[in-house]
Amino acid sequence: MAASPLHIGIVACSAEGAALCYRTLCTEAPGLLGRAYAHPEVSLHGHSFADYDACITRDDWVGVAELMLDSARKLAAGGARFLICPDNTIHQAFRFLEGRSPLPWLHIAEVVAAEAVRRGFRKLGLTGTRWLVASEVYPEKLAARGLAWVRPEEADRLECSRIIMEELVNGRFPPEGVRTFQAVIGRLKDAGCDAVVLGCTEIPLIISDANSPLPTLDSTRLLARAAIRRALEGA
């Protein structure tokens, strides 16, 4: 009998990003497993988003890491074999997780960088919350693969972050938010980018290849697909 795929643990932050990641896992796995409705075992744990938001707002990444580690321990106790976190911003806490987590993680920016190389992109525009875009989460992983990147102008960062935090994470998708992201991505295209990183797991809820001025790298779905592959490789 073939071994079962590895049990995937999801460390959730916002409900919208975690739900999209989980839904992608469950809907795309059957095609790889060759069996209707089949997917690896999945467990999810999430602390209150308010707890994460409080830490992020005061720039307390150690506090973010402690929340993530608590989720990691609970998922490990429940049988998960490796972890994913469908939230780009809190990947800034990864430097405080190293050597302390009970399980290995797939890093969302590493997954996106690998896909950019596979598709032949060379210069990526970054979108996401203001904390993520200002951080080294993506530049560090992109530089390791010889990729260039462009950050939006400050005003664009702040408006995109406002839309994410006030609208998208609350399940609201106003058309003016779509237009704002399209305009920001258009300016990244003018700056020479050949693709855009949807570096917030809620952005794919309003932006896709169908309405983006640039090809998109959907961090949420790419992470879910990488988790499926990892689960199958470890079986």
Predicted regions and their residues:
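Non-catalytic structural scaffold of enzyme domains
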Residues: 1-235
